């Protein structure tokens, strides 16, 4: 029972952080593009496209984070098939978007962006159904003072730091790539 109390508190705090972080990025998307892809900012078409792509696809990060959380719960219950199958949903969604939706868009890349977002919702929906079937769907509460949360944060901080260094490197690559001419070898 204690582990489920922790999972519910973790789910609540995780949802809160994901929601507010996603909301902030969506609201400041042009600033976000200026910081992380400055080369796009001074080309009106590229800037508008980048802002639109960010606003359409950024929620996918929150959705896939919840899918990863669900996968962890399922793995602890010896259920490995669905977490392994989940990326296939993403691929199928993008293929369908590219083949069937792209021709109906003036700028076909929008179809792929919407395909990414739809894939995230489908992945999460399938995971929610699977967790309900095994009676392990967390019921998020917002108990930020749960003793397990502080212990969890202390244990996960080194992993976040290590992963963050890799992400910073990728962001720097993106900044430099955005400054190159279209079609430049990278």
Language model feature labels by segment:
Residues 1-186:
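Membrane-embedded alpha-helical bundles of multi-pass transporters/translocases
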């Amino acid at each position: 029972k204690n582990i489920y109390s922790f999972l519910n508190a973790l789910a609540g705090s995780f949802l809160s952080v994901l929601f507010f972080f996603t909301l902030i990025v969506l609201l400041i998307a042009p600033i976000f593009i200026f910081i992380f892809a400055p080369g796009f900012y001074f080309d009106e078409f590229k800037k508008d496209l980048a802002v639109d792509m960010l606003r359409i696809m950024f929620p996918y990060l929150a959705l896939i984070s919840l899918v990863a959380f669900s996968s962890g719960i399922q793995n602890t219950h010896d259920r490995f098939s669905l977490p392994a199958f989940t990326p296939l949903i993403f691929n199928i969604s993008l293929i369908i978007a590219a083949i069937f939706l792209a021709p109906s868009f003036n700028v076909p890349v929008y179809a792929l962006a919407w395909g990414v977002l739809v894939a995230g919702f489908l992945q999460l929906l399938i995971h929610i159904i699977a967790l309900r079937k095994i009676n392990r769907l967390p019921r998020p509460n917002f108990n930020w003072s749960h003793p397990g949360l502080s212990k969890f944060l202390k244990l996960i901080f080194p992993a976040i730091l290590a992963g963050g260094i890799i992400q910073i490197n990728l962001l720097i690559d993106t900044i430099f790539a955005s400054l190159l001419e279209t079609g430049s070898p990278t």
